[in-house]
């Protein structure tokens, strides 16, 4: 008896080579039937318009704040005078003493509020100067640029004997337009302030990165970074000749953060990742050091945005300070103190 199995007949249809679909064959699509056109909403201009309203608010808010302060000061003064006169008429010397003491405290408080409002007014004036500078840069006018730059130099605390300022004055002639005069002032005078500001930003950014990299407490990181950021903004404002009060610092920090939100935070992650990959540090830096690098880059970006808001003349493409140089310095600093052996 044979061990061979009986035959099996398969009745399935065998596809020939001609029946197989050709993968590289051309296919025609009807655009109206196959694809549904959709409109992409552009949110970036809306965000920029919102930021413009935050940075340069309408004049109604200015008058409202001044009116409220004047009304409050008048009511406080009226109440103080009325209390003192009533106590003197009634012979209530204890009430008179308390009224005088409270009046002195109220006067000190009103003085501090008035000083803060004055400094906030100076910050608003800076934004109006920037707006005027933008108009002059975009116009073909003649005869206003030199006076505008001289006023900016006076407000910024640039001395007459400053070599850069003196060189700019000797370079200006009647053949230059207002836009050319502003560009020359930016390249000769404001650039010197930018160099000082860049050194300050680099120092504060590397210090913040190093503090976060070696700090064991998260709450300490937050306090240190906040303190360093406020100190950095205060130093930058001094370089550009602007005296900031407490309210002005808060306002400027809010404007800087709003500006950063418009620009987007994804660039920070991409740039930091590229630096880590290029320097072969991704596998050597600890998680804590990575946080330090991120905080340092964020501080540097914060400082650059503060520079953009504090400069009397808007950035020019060829003179704008880039984040790349400061970023490399931050990564190198953190790597030098936290690299694993």
From Swiss-Prot:
Q: How does it sit in the membrane?
A: Multi-pass membrane protein
Cell compartments where the protein resides = Cell inner membrane
Alphabetically list the UniProt keywords: Cell inner membrane, Cell membrane, Membrane, Transmembrane, Transmembrane helix
Specify where it is mainly localized.
membrane
Domain of life, per the record? Bacteria
Cell membrane found in the keyword field: yes
- InterPro entries in the record: DUF697, UPF0283
Pfam families xref list: DUF697
Residue intervals passing through the bilayer? 64-84, 93-113, 207-227, 255-275
One Gene Ontology CC term in the entry = plasma membrane
Q: Which family does it belong to?
A: Belongs to the UPF0283 family.
Spell out the HAMAP family in the cross-references. UPF0283
Q: What is this protein called?
A: UPF0283 membrane protein VV2076
Q: Which organism is it from?
A: Vibrio vulnificus (strain YJ016)
């Amino acid at each position: 008896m044979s061990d061979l199995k009986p035959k099996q007949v398969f009745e399935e249809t065998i596809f020939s080579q001609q029946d197989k679909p050709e993968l590289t064959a051309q296919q025609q699509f009807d655009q109206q039937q196959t694809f549904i056109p959709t409109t992409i909403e552009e949110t970036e201009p809306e965000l920029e318009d919102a930021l413009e309203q935050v940075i340069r608010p309408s004049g109604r808010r200015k008058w409202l704040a001044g009116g409220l302060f004047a009304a409050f000061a008048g009511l406080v003064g009226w109440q103080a005078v009325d209390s003192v006169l009533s106590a003197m008429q009634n012979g209530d010397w204890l009430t008179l003493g308390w009224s005088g003491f409270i009046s002195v405290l109220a006067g000190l408080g009103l003085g501090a509020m008035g000083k803060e409002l004055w400094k906030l007014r100076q910050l608003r004036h800076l934004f109006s100067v920037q707006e005027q500078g933008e108009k002059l840069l975009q116009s073909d006018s003649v005869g206003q640029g030199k006076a505008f730059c001289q006023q900016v130099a006076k407000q910024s605390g640039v001395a007459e004997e400053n070599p850069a300022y003196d060189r700019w004055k000797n370079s200006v002639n009647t053949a230059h337009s207002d836009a050319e005069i502003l560009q020359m002032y930016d390249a000769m005078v404001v650039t010197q302030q930018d160099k000082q500001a860049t050194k300050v930003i680099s120092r504060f950014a590397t210090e913040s990165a190093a503090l976060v990299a070696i700090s064991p407490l998260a709450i300490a990181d937050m306090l240190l970074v906040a303190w360093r950021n406020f100190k950095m903004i205060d130093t930058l404002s001094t370089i550009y000749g602007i005296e900031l009060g407490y309210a002005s610092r808060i306002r400027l920090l809010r404007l800087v953060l709003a500006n950063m939100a418009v620009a987007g935070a994804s660039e920070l992650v991409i740039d930091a990742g590229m630096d880590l990959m290029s320097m072969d540090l991704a596998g050597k830096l600890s998680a804590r050091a990575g946080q330090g690098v991120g905080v340092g880059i964020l501080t540097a970006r914060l400082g650059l945005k503060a520079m953009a808001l504090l400069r009397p003349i808007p950035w020019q493409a060829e003179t704008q300070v880039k984040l790349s140089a400061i970023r490399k310095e931050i990564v190198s600093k953190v790597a030098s103190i936290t690299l694993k052996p």
